[in-house]
Amino acid sequence: MMRIVIFLLTNLAVMVVFGILLTCVGTHSSNTVRLMIISGLFGFCGAFISLLMSKFIALRSVGGKVISQPQNETEHWLLNIILNQAQKIGITMPQVAIYNAPDMNAFATGPSRNNSLVAVSTGLLQNMPRTEIEAVIAHEISHISNGDMVTITLISGIVNTFVIFISRFLAQLTAGFIGSNNEESNNGNKLVYMIVSTILELAFGILASIIVLWFSRYREFYADAGSANIVGCDKMIAALQRLKTSYEPKVTNNIKIFCINGYQKSLSEFFMSHPPLNKRIEALRYGTYMK
């Protein structure tokens, strides 16, 4: 709840600062005020809808099935491990789901520490020793305990507000500077506005995604450290080493950011949701992020 309050106050502060700056430079108008409100609402609403529906969206994306009543020994074991770790860390027992995928993977999502979901792939259950699965689950439990899913979603909402407002505001200025007031020019102004706003939204959207992905990489180190605190550093290192042999995850990008194995081919680490596995292992060995 505190994160959501901070998010609301941050968005409000951003809009107020923009309003003051625009007034100082003499570009404050009813159109600009309307754009500020629309940008803020899109930033708010998009983030909140994504947050509230995160479990539903995640399950639909991977075809996961929630375990309500365990049907076999593996499901019994999985529920017991997650329950024990949740109690140890002091959070409400998450919902538990299994989804069919060959890669060794797991993810956590949900709107709060006490309303969350942990999902594991069949590939993880079939190909990883249980001691290492415990470490993977502890990694996801740490994400929930740290509130990482909520924070990443709220950061996305804030940067989306910036992207929408700045791109459309600059597009308005460009269209107004190029055009005039006759009818033919007004049609041209609209075209200029659409082209410029689209280009700027794409460009600023890339910059915004770099910010969100940086935060995601940063929090992965702390989730690894949290897992090491719960089950031991050796188990977490062994799990990460085994993930090197896994298939590339087949989940969608909005889910991949929450997976323990977010491997992806990229020209630059800037566009990766997870740090390279070797860096994560090195951080654990040196205790860089251990509390």
Curated annotation (Swiss-Prot):
Pfam families: Peptidase_M48. GO terms for biological process: proteolysis. InterPro entries: HtpX_protease (IPR050083), Pept_M48_protease_HtpX (IPR022919), Peptidase_M48 (IPR001915). It is a multi-pass membrane protein. It comes from Baumannia cicadellinicola subsp. Homalodisca coagulata. PANTHER family: PROTEASE HTPX. Its cofactor is Zn(2+). GO terms for cellular component: plasma membrane. Belongs to the peptidase M48B family. Zn(2+) binds at residues 139, 143, 220. Its EC number is 3.4.24.-. This is Protease HtpX. GO terms for molecular function: metalloendopeptidase activity; zinc ion binding. The active site is at residue 140. The keyword Hydrolase applies.
